[in-house]
Amino acid sequence: MSEVKKPLALIILDGFGYSESDKYNAINAAKAPTWRKIWAENPKTTIATSGMAVGLPEGQMGNSEVGHMTLGAGRVVYQNFTRINKAIADGDFYTNPVYTKAVDDAQSQGKAVHVIGLLSDGGVHSHEDHMIAMMELAVKRGAEKVYMHAFLDGRDTPPRSAKAPLQKTEEKLKALGGGKIASIIGRFFALDRDNRWDRVQQAFDLMVDGKAAFTAQSATAGLEAAYERDENDEFVKATAIVDADGKPVTIEDGDAVIFMNFRPDRARQLTNAFVDKNFDGFARARVPALSDFVMTTEYSADIDTSCAYPPEDLVNSFGEVMAKNGKKQLRIAETEKYAHVTFFFSGGQESLYEGEDRILVPSPQVETYDEQPEMSAPEVTAKLVDAIENGGYDAIICNYANCDQVGHTGDFDASVKAVEAVDAALAEVFAALERVGGEALITADHGNVELMYDDEAQQLHTQHTTLPVPLVYVGKRDISLEQGGSLADIAPTMLALLDVPQPTEMNGRNLVKFSK
């Protein structure tokens, strides 16, 4: 048996925001005695998870990738979203050498430029302004065949909100005097991340072979037809936008494809379908010999293709500091959030640090998580309790995915059950910590289930919120937590509790005040 230690656990309740209002609030509607007790009796505060506090534009909701990177970094990391916004604002975007080479090489051979990505103002995986800017770059550099293949959101935005970005794009292209939206399809198909290749194939076949369930004369007409079929944005079936002759636009040999998503996880599978020489996800009728395939950010170090905005090094994150100080750490989550407690929490590093262990618990194989709101929380909890009692860890980072993943479905009753499942898990975790004399910080990476309906849009609120999230200390020490913090302050706070020096690169602040 390993040495029994008194670990510090960081428990991340994904999508568990803070709102005093009971209106549309699945947390306040849930039977959650464990949560209510610690919130009433323990040192607590709320912290910011959105906007400039996490390196995003002001007012922009946070997300799991940004949240976990900020949690682990202990500083504000200017996210790719902000980085690209800044490049567009100062003009550097339009001279980015990777983008311009892709456009110029295709144009010089009379070939087409295809801009693909999530056309949305959600700002989680992409932004419509980036896609429109890319179309503008191509048209202004003289490319005559410039096409957009738009993936529709409805997950990080209201379920039926795609009309505005489609109209905005059509109006901009009309003003530019070039470019066309060539196809639309829901992100459910194009941006799968769980190896459901049958979905991705529908997006690939649409763009490469023009194989479509439906055709339309314009993108907005195609969307309206989808709504008539009762398809929300996320689930819009493959629709080719055709001219009067009925012929779809297809990606051909010598064309350039530019993928404008800046968040990697949901861009990898479709990218691999285009560029992986050993691809075996599905049978491709045709694989175009592209002049270039550009990923806007590095979707994976293993993907061998052009990258417009390569990663910037992030040194002395929490995991690295722990390793340098000879400490033992564990990262644990189910599949949906495993990358977040590992890759993102480690500042974009795939490999393990010295003294780091990882536990991956498979997520349930269901169509949507409202079918199983408890997800794999019981299995995560069983392994977490064992790690607390027997693992000999100094620090444990754990994510419970339920509130975010179920909250995205918009199902209020299922979201209440998700909260209750997490509450039951917390009861077991706290009991284990008490048995070994351990302690915990409970927080979230962003909100979701505390606001499940959008009064203004008159639709379900399936996306993240900009509300603050709780931070609670559970343990025997007599401490208080300072107000006005953010996710960037969590790593410094953990290091203070562990009596590990905070490196200069971490400019977040320790929120713990120890009683004298």
UniProtKB/Swiss-Prot annotation:
Binding site for substrate: 125, 155-156, 187, 193, 263-266, 337
One GO BP annotation of this record: glucose catabolic process
Family membership noted in the UniProt record: Belongs to the BPG-independent phosphoglycerate mutase family.
Pathway(s) served: Carbohydrate degradation; glycolysis; pyruvate from D-glyceraldehyde 3-phosphate: step 3/5
Catalysed reactions listed for this entry: (2R)-2-phosphoglycerate = (2R)-3-phosphoglycerate
Subunit structure: Monomer.
HAMAP family for the chain: GpmI (MF_01038)
Keyword Transport annotated: no
Residues binding Mn(2+) 1: 404, 408, 464
Membrane-traversing stretches: none
Protein name: 2,3-bisphosphoglycerate-independent phosphoglycerate mutase
Cofactor binding description: Binds 2 manganese ions per subunit.
Enzyme's top EC category: isomerase
